[in-house]
């Protein structure tokens, strides 16, 4: 079974004075871009089976807006307060690619499509580590930059527990804007 991993970098955040990095909210542009990212996922991937989100305010905000656009909120089993289809994981905040791989290895095997909402450089480094092969157009876009609201779609060729370097193929890379 080929699995799919969608790696979404959080939308553009604001920099209010006196606010810790972890607690920064989305900027107005980020609000629009997060919705656009959700629409892109809905139209090109579909609703994920499981979502892993950093505990940072901007990633949680990105997912909430994207989920609404996908139509994921209200789906059976969705409850932000309980484990299951949504995991808010503090390890994703400021994570290296190696840490993100560890987090993703914990996904249940029944998950066909997983979506990770995280930060750079972790998102970019994760995609580079996992993707043994790359669609040329996607690779060209990703080589330039992994901007806020950037979305990488990878086909994973192993069980989640076996995820590692070279175990996926980068299929698409997009940067939806609202």
Feature roles, as predicted:
Residues 2-91, 95:
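Active-site-proximal alpha-helix that buttresses catalytic centers in soluble enzyme cores
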Residues 5, 113-115, 151:
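Residue-level preference for the first positions of well-ordered beta-strands
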Residues 56-57, 120-121, 148:
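Alpha-helix N-cap/helix-start capping motif
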């Amino acid at each position: 079974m080929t699995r799919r991993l969608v790696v979404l970098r959080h939308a553009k955040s604001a920099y209010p004075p006196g606010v810790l990095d972890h607690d920064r909210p989305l900027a107005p542009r980020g609000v629009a871009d997060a919705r656009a990212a959700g629409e892109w996922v809905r139209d090109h991937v579909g609703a994920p089976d499981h979502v892993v989100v950093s505990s940072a305010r901007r990633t949680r905000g990105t997912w909430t807006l994207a989920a609404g656009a996908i139509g994921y909120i209200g789906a059976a089993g969705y409850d932000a307060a309980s484990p299951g289809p949504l995991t808010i994981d503090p390890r994703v905040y400021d994570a290296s690619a190696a840490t993100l791989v560890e987090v993703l290895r914990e996904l249940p095997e029944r998950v066909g499509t997983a979506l990770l909402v995280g930060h750079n450089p972790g998102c970019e480094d994760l995609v580079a580590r996992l993707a043994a092969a790359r669609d040329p157009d996607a690779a060209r876009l990703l080589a330039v930059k992994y901007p806020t609201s950037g979305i990488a779609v990878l086909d994973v060729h192993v069980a989640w527990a076996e995820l590692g370097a070279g175990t996926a193929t980068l299929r698409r890379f997009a940067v939806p804007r609202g």
